[in-house]
Amino acid sequence: MAFNFNWSPLTADANFYTRAQDLLTAALNKSPKPPIIVDDIIVTELNLGSIPPELEILEVGDLAEDRFRGIFKMSYSGDAFLTLKTRVQANPLNTYLLTRPSFASPLPLAAATPLTIPLQITLSDFKLSGFVVLVFSKQKGITVVFRNDPLESLKVSSTFDSIPFVRDFLQKEIEAQLRILFMDELPAIIHRLSLRLWVPEYRDGEQLETQDTASRTEGPGQDPLASPPQDPVDALGNALNESDIASLSLESSVETHSLFSQKNLLRLAALTDSQRTLSLFTPSIREVVYRAWTSPTDSGEATAGVISPASPALSRTHSQVGNISSFPDTASMVSSQTRSTTSTHSFSSYGLNTGSSRSKVHSRKRKKRVVDLRRPKTTDDAASVSDESAFTESTSAPSVYSAPLPIVREQPDDPVTPPLSPETGLHLPPVPERHRLSTSRPGIRRGADAFVQSGESSSSARRRSDVDVDATPRGTMRSHVAMTRCSEKPEPEAPQQLPSTILPFADEKASSNLVDQALVERLAGEIARRMRDEKMPGSSTCTPFWDRLNHDEAPPPAYGH
């Protein structure tokens, strides 16, 4: 089946070209343009040429007097051309800065000056090939749909043809825009043109819409800030009365626009300070305190109320001499006030332990050793021992403050003292008192002498006492305690005799004879301890725990020996 296209009426009708140019201009400016184009794209010239397209019928779906539906294969290589006119930005730095936020740009002055150049582009030598679905109806107009991209090539001629880079850039960008035009915009343009030609109702509706739009745009616009508000204030926030407002000229827009409503300013201030956050839409939650609400003064007062060394909430105020920087924990304060059981004193020791500079694991080991080696008399003493052990890491110093004896002459201002606790006498074996003195005290006496002579601060004295206590041989203490656990009752005279042994260590001077005697007694005690260990390796039934501690230093013998 052959068709003859009468192409001459399209080339001779001037009104057709005018309407087509308007539709093409609207279509080219509808989609977002690249930032290099700073003005509208105007179609100044359109010519379909004298060579018609070639159509090959592939399928006819519907054929009647007032309707037609078919699928065609179209190919076009004619002399049609299209001329566009616009303005472009020649300064690439200005184009780059326009596409970036203002707070992120360096804001150059001379280099960012815009430079717009008029541009004229002519599109010619179109080569099209594709499959077209054509539907015609007198009531609905013409509908053309491309099943594939019909654009094969075209020629772009512009003002910048002498610059190869600009020429290639324009060629690539215009080809991309034309592909979108053929697939999306051109079918809509053809459909509207057909409705104008064959559907009078559509034509009348467009005329009415155009008239309504023109009537709405006529006349001067109304300025909402032309009249002053009901409660005006000046630029400094001072309220203005009616006489001041009357003296102002309504013609001067600068003065009138500076009159802002006080109510609106208060609302804006409330929005800005909403929950003291950057977001104006932060949801409010009941019974919740936001971190932004707490000012530095409030947080400082709250911290000082809990961790101050002079705080009355802490029963042992000198236990925080080493380090005061800890987070405010109200639970530790409450527990230290009302502790009466073993559970409460462990909770308060946790609150104090968080402020120390030592790790929790290290403090927990020391705490366990102190609890295992002692049998506290009262609950308050036990709580004080656990509190002090988390800071001093000493097995003897805390009990001197928690349960002082009237015989001992100690200084109340001294935060740390090296003598051993009187309670340890309850667990010592029934050996003469001089053996206990010789086996476990030389290191402590040397630490006390050095502390009195040097006169250092409390922190340095604490470190020195820790080193001396750790230097005390643990083997002798473990053997004595193991024998004590096996015995039926502790020695009743130990608490009365032990304070007399503390007095020589509190003394500032010691004779050399005592040092020699202590060394001899230490050697004798060591020999006696080894003999007792050899005689009773497995005779006791309550020594597995202490044997395990001793075996940590020396491995046990093989089974069967």
UniProtKB/Swiss-Prot annotation:
Biased composition (Basic residues): 359-369
Stretches with biased composition (Polar residues): 314-329, 386-399
UniProt cross-references to CDD domains, sorted A to Z: SMP_Mdm34
UniProt domain SMP-LTD: residue ranges: 1-195
Region feature Disordered, mapped onto this chain: 208-233, 299-474, 531-561
Subcellular location: Mitochondrion outer membrane
Residue ranges, compositional bias (Basic and acidic residues): 370-380
This protein's record includes keyword Transport: yes
UniProt GO BP: mitochondrial genome maintenance; mitochondrion organization; mitochondrion-endoplasmic reticulum membrane tethering; phospholipid transport
Gene Ontology CC: ERMES complex
Source organism, top-level taxon: Eukaryota
Assembly behavior: Component of the ER-mitochondria encounter structure (ERMES) or MDM complex, composed of mmm1, mdm10, mdm12 and mdm34.
Similarity annotation: Belongs to the MDM34 family.
Protein name: Mitochondrial distribution and morphology protein 34
Taxonomic lineage of the native organism: Eukaryota, Fungi, Dikarya, Ascomycota, Pezizomycotina
